[in-house]
Amino acid sequence: NGVTSIAMESTGTYWQNLFSTLVGQGFDVILVNGRQTKNIKGKKTDIKDCQWIQKLHSLGLLSASFLPDSDTDTVRTYSRHRQNLLKQSASCTRRMQKYLRLMNMRLEVVVRDIVGLTGSCIIEAFLNGEHKGEELAKLRHYNCRKSEEEIAKALQFNGRKDYLFALKQEWDSYKHLKQQIMDTDLQIDRLLKEFIEKDEHKK
């Protein structure tokens, strides 16, 4: 009935599909923060909320939230996904450190990063059956501050196979997440190159 402009709240991710559909149909859609549309009076219902938003919009009292263009929004989606993968990877690392400690494998005491050069080599060899601290210490990278002797003393496996099993699963998950991060980085890089080629002004 002659409607050309629509205002809607940005609630979580629920608005995105509806917003895209309305814009695709030619409507001028204003996305507003819920703080602007808060109605203190009376009991809240969806219908009353809609009527209140319509009234504020018709009086010109709502300001639109910033919305990135489609290219920026696409990169932002990938970037957020990458951040989630990094958080999962960090959680995996913390759990691996816990299981190593429970097996009397105090790797975090002798290396700065248990998934760094020395740490990764030691974990991989340990999971492949090498449980002697002296042999694992030989995998020390040349720039590691601790000596082979110090590393060997810190790695004295107590034989707990249950923790060994858990460590193996966390290590597999960690490697999978690292690959996903690399794949996401490649995707972001590819998209950025496409956007730059599309817009001569961005070169």
Regions found by a protein language model. Name each.
Residues N1-K203:
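A detector of single, family-specific signature residues
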